[in-house]
Amino acid sequence: MAKKSMIERDRKRARLITKYAAKRKNLLVEIKTATSLEDKFNLHRKLQQLPRNSAPVRSHNRCTITGRPRGYFRDFGLSRHVLREYALQGFLPGVVKASW
């Protein structure tokens, strides 16, 4: 199980990403359409003044049960350990153990 502080930090990042998403997107569009170099620098400065954790690249996928950051399956939102456990117990409909 991941540390509670790491899980909470990722949740905080997710909240910041949603809060500043529109503002960040508008600034990026303005940067692309700006013609003068000075305008672009000013817009970049505004973009850099946004919180660092509001950038989507800083978020990390984590298992919803354990908070494990590695071995994450996007389709289920679970780590490989929990996915295997749930699949064997029949909690994931349509998921069966492979046999050939």
UniProtKB/Swiss-Prot annotation:
Pfam families reported in the protein's UniProt record: Ribosomal_S14
Chief place where the protein resides: plastid
Gene Ontology BP, a term: translation
InterPro entries referenced in this protein's UniProt entry, alphabetically: Ribosomal_uS14, Ribosomal_uS14_bac/plastid, Ribosomal_uS14_CS
Compartment(s) where it occurs, according to its Swiss-Prot or TrEMBL record: Plastid, Chloroplast
Matching SUPFAM superfamilies: Glucocorticoid receptor-like (DNA-binding domain)
GO MF, any single term: structural constituent of ribosome
Alphabetical list of PROSITE patterns matching this protein: RIBOSOMAL_S14
Tree of life domain: Eukaryota
UniProt KW keywords: Chloroplast, Plastid, Ribonucleoprotein, Ribosomal protein, RNA-binding, rRNA-binding
Family, per entry: Belongs to the universal ribosomal protein uS14 family.
Function statement: Binds 16S rRNA, required for the assembly of 30S particles.
Subunit structure: Part of the 30S ribosomal subunit.
Listed name of the protein: Small ribosomal subunit protein uS14c
Native source species: Chlorella vulgaris (Green alga)
Phylogenetic classification of the source organism: Eukaryota, Viridiplantae, Chlorophyta, core chlorophytes, Trebouxiophyceae
Gene that encodes the chain: rps14
